């Protein structure tokens, strides 16, 4: 395979996905408590679905903060951000609330994607103070008792798995990738 012909990681992923058996496993949890797997086709569709939501809420070049441990949803989110024209700002899960506040103040993300309630608790005080954050997407369902999280605007929060249940139109499945080799990429 000649990598010179690919302008971006997302373009390379779509090329590889088209060559694979749609039912072959591409991503899998390494957590022994979760045996969830994702085929190449599911992964591709999930990237389109998350990208659709991101595109509706960002302009090209906007930052999207990604706070998660290594898991399949991280990969899907990173490629969805790239497909949307956003820039992934990855963050360690070991940061403190002050670290996250500094990072959010510095990069001013339009979207924050966060893995679980524990991480969301560290971020939420800052999220509630910042008007530039349009959406927060969570991999794990937000705790039913919102008082623990002090969520001011419930419409700002989206559930990753709920987004994945949505259908896509054919136009949403177009791999319209306007990325160049010089475009920013999180690797």
Where are these regions (language model features)?
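Flexible, non-catalytic linker and terminal segments flanking ANL/adenylate-forming cores
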Residues: 1-11, 30
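AMP-dependent adenylate-forming
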Residues: 12-39, 144-146
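Adenylate-forming
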Residues: 13-17, 27, 43, 47, ...
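Conserved pre-ATP/AMP-binding loop-to-beta segment of ANL
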Residues: 23-25, 156-158, 162-187
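Conserved AMP-binding/adenylate-forming
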Residues: 36-38, 51-95
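Short beta-strand elements of ligand-binding domains
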Residues: 68, 91-92, 133-142
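Helix N-cap/beta->alpha junction signal
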Residues: 68-70, 115-116, 140, 183
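Conserved ATP-dependent adenylate/AMP-binding module captured primarily in the ANL superfamily
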Residues: 95-126
